[in-house]
């Protein structure tokens, strides 16, 4: 009888691992978690986590820079995902409460999303799914055409007030991969405010406008003399979230930007 029981145990399916309770404080991490097939592990997300649509049904924990610590703690998470750059105080407060925090490094190149995918997958016990997603995204990056001999000079206006990007942000690299050259690529900074005078002096040949309308941009002082305006390359058609989040949708949006810059070639 004992031998029979042992044989039965050998052939019974293994009990599934207990699902983790995860909180994501970054929209890009939320997208990655869903892409890994781990959306059901999420018990809390930031108020900015709006993709995929299923994220809207998950408990909100506030701004990713200033999350509601009590709310996060009340969700009894096994792990909380946040950016190491987003605020040491958040990590410190949660850690002091005994909450495990995965503070992930900032993506400074577009392909850094592959590292983020692997780190999140490992923390969730989904290494195989992480390897598969990482391989798919890597293939998408590798399939991108080489840069043209003379890349267009591109100004990225990420937000009102002249907020733009220097070489320390993955957005600058995204522009390069799309075949452009960031006019502020020489700035060893991430995000900063450029003056309108600086933009005019650099005379970009294309503008990526992630906030506001082309009409408003073209109405600015002396904008009509800018090469981008003359060429009709004030681009507003990008999906802001897909382009500004280092997640699974980024390679597709980079390819879309290339088409908007150069047409279907």
Predicted regions and their residues:
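Sec-dependent N-terminal signal peptides
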Residues: 4-13
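Sec/Tat signal peptide C-region and signal peptidase I cleavage site
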Residues: 14-19
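A short, structured surface patch at a secondary-structure boundary
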Residues: 20-85, 183
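Extracytoplasmic substrate-binding proteins
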Residues: 21, 89-163, 184-186, 202, ...
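Solvent-exposed loop/turn segments at secondary-structure junctions
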Residues: 28-32, 48-51, 80-81, 86-88, ...
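His/Asp/Glu-enriched short active-site or ligand-binding loop at hydrolase and phosphoryl-transfer sites
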Residues: 46, 168-191, 233-236
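Short helices/loops that flank or line small-molecule/ion binding pockets
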Residues: 69-76, 97, 193-203
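A ligand-binding cleft/hinge motif common to bilobed small-molecule-binding domains
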Residues: 86-96, 206-225
């Amino acid at each position: 009888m004992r031998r029979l029981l042992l044989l039965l145990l050998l052939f019974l399916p293994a009990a599934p691992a207990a699902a983790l309770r995860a909180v994501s404080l970054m929209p890009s991490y939320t997208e990655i978690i869903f892409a890994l097939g781990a959306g059901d592990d999420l018990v809390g997300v930031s108020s900015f986590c709006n993709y995929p649509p299923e994220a809207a049904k998950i408990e909100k924990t506030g701004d990713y820079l200033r999350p509601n610590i009590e709310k996060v703690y009340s969700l009894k998470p096994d792990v909380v995902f946040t950016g190491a750059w987003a605020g040491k105080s958040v990590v410190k407060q949660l850690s002091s409460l005994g909450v495990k925090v995965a503070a992930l490094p900032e993506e400074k190149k577009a392909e850094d999303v592959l590292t983020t995918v692997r780190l999140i997958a490992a923390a969730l016990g989904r290494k195989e799914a992480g390897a598969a997603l990482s391989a798919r995204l890597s293939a998408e990056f590798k399939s991108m055409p080489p840069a043209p001999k003379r890349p267009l000079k591109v100004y990225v206006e990420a937000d009102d007030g002249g907020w733009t990007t220097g070489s320390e942000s993955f957005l600058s690299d995204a522009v390069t991969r799309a075949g452009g050259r960031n006019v502020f690529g020489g700035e060893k900074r991430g995000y900063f405010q450029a003056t309108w005078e600086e933009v005019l002096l650099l005379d970009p040949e294309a503008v990526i406008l992630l906030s506001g309308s082309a009409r408003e941009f073209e109405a600015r002082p002396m904008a009509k003399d800018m090469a981008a305006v003359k060429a009709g390359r004030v681009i507003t058609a990008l999906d802001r979230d897909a382009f500004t989040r280092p997640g699974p949708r980024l390679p597709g949006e980079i390819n879309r930007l290339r088409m908007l810059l150069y047409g279907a070639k």
